[in-house]
Amino acid sequence: MKIPRDLSGAQLVKVLCRDWGYRVAHQEGSHIILQTEEPAHQRLSIPNHNPVRVGTLNSIIRAVSRHKGVERQELLDTLR
């Protein structure tokens, strides 16, 4: 599946918090900082832009899928 090109930062944060166990730690300017303790500590910086650039989104998806030990495709399916 292709990476969505119309996904906003707020939508991405909502999906990561709802489906993948992340929570909002704080916000610094236009970036929302998420963190999780499952399976280990990780912090992510999500730009609160509309839309999030494709390369940035791809990097975030890669980081989450590696940390959670899931396939990239499984993560992309939850973004739709």
Predicted stretch roles:
Residues M1-E28:
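N-terminal first-folded block
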Residues K2, P47, S65:
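Short, flexible active-site loop motifs that bind/organize anionic cofactors or intermediates
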Residues P4, G9, V13, H41, ...:
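Generic N-terminal initiation segments characterized by hydrophobic and/or small/turn-forming residues
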Residues R18, Q27, Q35-T36, V64-H67, ...:
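Compositionally biased, intrinsically disordered low-complexity segments
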Residues R23-S59:
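A short, structured beta-strand/loop element
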Residues P51-R80:
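C-terminal structural segments of small proteins and small subunits
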